Regions:
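Hydrophobic transmembrane alpha-helical segments in integral membrane proteins
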Residues: 1-17
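Juxtamembrane segments at transmembrane-helix boundaries
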Residues: 18-37, 47-183, 190, 200, ...
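Conserved nucleotide-binding and Mg2+-coordinating catalytic segments in signaling enzymes
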Residues: 220-239, 260-274, 282
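Nucleotide second-messenger and two-component phosphorelay signaling modules
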Residues: 243-256, 260, 271
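GGDEF/GGEEF active-site signature
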Residues: 279-285
Length: 285
């Protein structure tokens, strides 16, 4: 049975919208910044593809240019947001705000050169492919926290999509007669459409797995630390002390224990209130 590029793109748009809705419901109300970035990225990707498919119904009109440019903006932004989420889950610093502004540069140049087809196709696919490659590299980068399971799902999906995206950009920029429209039934386009559907599902699973890992780490931290001072609680401290003492005895290392006591702490609570007493504990900790 022959595959139709436009039909595959419409199916993908439905799939990515469903995944965006599913992630929004699954992660609804979660305070994690990484989870919020992942939700926003999925939503931006879904709206971007809706705009791209809709632009095909306004061929050679101002609506085509407007919807296509908006699609490029949202797709670029979605990858930046997913990259931010992955970096947060891996314990890396946040992306500089300047990089978000840089994501606006491609859609602007895309709009200015919209009527030059090779330029806009090469530019858009080149920039988006580079973002995918960066995201894949960040996900599979060794040495940082994060289970290899969810990292391999996201990293592998993005690497495969980056390869096809670069290929599509080369065709549009240098072999335009082989790829005159985004719905052209070229093998690269068909492969890209199929990969999009698979990668969206795998990336969604990877995001949920990463969030679960983050939630488990938070629960573990809550179980072994004091909620006010964030220092080890009595149970965790006793377990840690036994291990340290055993190591000191085994290897003959000296060991020092320091105990800090706050004088007149009850008077602080009685005279200035428990809120001030809590602040004193936090300052000492």
């Amino acid at each position: 049975m022959p595959l139709d590029s436009l039909t595959l793109m419409i199916v993908y748009t439905v799939n990515v919208t469903a995944v965006a809705f599913g992630l929004s419901v699954a992660l609804l109300g979660q305070g994690s910044r990484a989870a919020l970035c992942a939700q926003a990225g999925a939503l931006a990707q879904a709206i971007g593809w809706i705009c791209l498919v809709a632009s095909g119904f306004f061929r050679d009109t101002w609506g085509d240019q407007l919807l296509s440019t908006l699609a490029m903006l949202l797709m670029s932004l979605s990858l930046a947001l997913l990259l931010q989420a992955v970096r947060k889950w891996r314990g890396s610093p946040c992306l500089p705000r300047a990089l978000y502004l840089a994501a606006l540069g491609m859609p602007l140049l895309y709009a200015l050169g919209f009527h030059h087809y090779p330029w806009r196709v090469g530019l858009a696919n080149g920039v988006i492919g580079a973002q995918m490659l960066w995201l894949a590299a960040e996900a599979i980068r060794p040495g940082a926290p994060g289970s290899w399971r969810w990292r391999s799902l996201i990293g592998g999906s993005m690497a495969a999509l980056a390869l096809v995206t670069f290929w599509r950009g080369v065709l549009g920029a240098f072999f335009t007669e082989l790829y005159p429209t985004f719905a052209t039934p070229h093998p690269v386009n068909l492969i890209g459409s199929l990969l999009n559907n698979a990668a969206t599902v795998l990336t969604g699973i990877g995001v949920l797995a990463a969030f679960r890992e983050e939630a488990e780490a938070q629960l573990k931290t809550l179980a072994i630390t004091d909620g006010l001072t964030q220092v080890l609680n009595r149970r965790a401290w006793s377990e840690r002390a036994e291990l340290q003492l055993s190591d000191a005895k085994r290897y003959g290392h000296p060991m020092i224990m320091l105990m800090i006591d706050l004088d007149h702490f009850k008077q602080i609570n009685d005279r200035r209130g428990h809120a001030t007493g809590d602040q004193a504990l936090q300052l000492t900790a």
